[in-house]
Amino acid sequence: LYALKYLKEQGYKPKHSFRFFFGCDEEKGMADVQYYAKNYKEPAFSVVPDVMFPVCNGEKGILEFDATRPVKSSKLVSFESGIMSNQVPAEAVAVLTLTGEETANVKEVVEAAGGTCENQADGSVKVYVHGIPAHAAFPEGSESAEVKMAGLLKKSGVLDEDAANLMDAICEMFGDYYGAGLNIPFEDEGSGKLTHVGGMCKLENGVFWQDVNIRYNVTAVYEVLMENITKTLKAHGFELTEAHDSAPCF
């Protein structure tokens, strides 16, 4: 807008029209752009101001993958966190089937950390935990609600073995944002540290699904990343089910 204002003030008379696009679905598939391209004429040239002033000379690679793990638990009914892949999750919700004493233990631990618990009509307890969201590329100062929930449930001591192991896996894989939990702690002079977040997850019908978003440095090798990630996932009982990669440029 400022560039066009400047050109107008200088008396510039363009030969072509200008259009502004305000997208609302960039982080979830860009369906709005697909709709526009289907119903309207596409511009001949576009400029996307998506970087801090004054200039960008590279972009980290973007690796997003899904992984699943079976969970055998009579205690942990459901566990869900996150609304988009490229964001440290702000909220997490879990439902547990517990005894009265176990419910009291969970409430004590969760409420001491600022979370809340609600008794449900079917006798289960629903747990809510809040984190501090941030973009996957800039996770500094954030707090993952998924990791926070996992840590609190493990600390309460009410989970059975497999559910407790899952909570340990979550904390180990996503407790830091710089690749250590997935055995990919890479960095370079040109683009800095690799970052990774567990953006979304859901436990449903005995299967835990996890989405992971990684921004990897420009000198990292995709094949090495995938090899280390796959080994780490397997060690925690996960199977890689789908992966999408956008190579870095520099």
Features from the language model and the residues they span:
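Acidic/histidine-rich catalytic neighborhood of metal-dependent amide-processing enzymes
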Residues: 1-72, 101, 107, 111, ...
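Metal-dependent amide/peptide-bond hydrolase catalytic core
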Residues: 64, 70-250
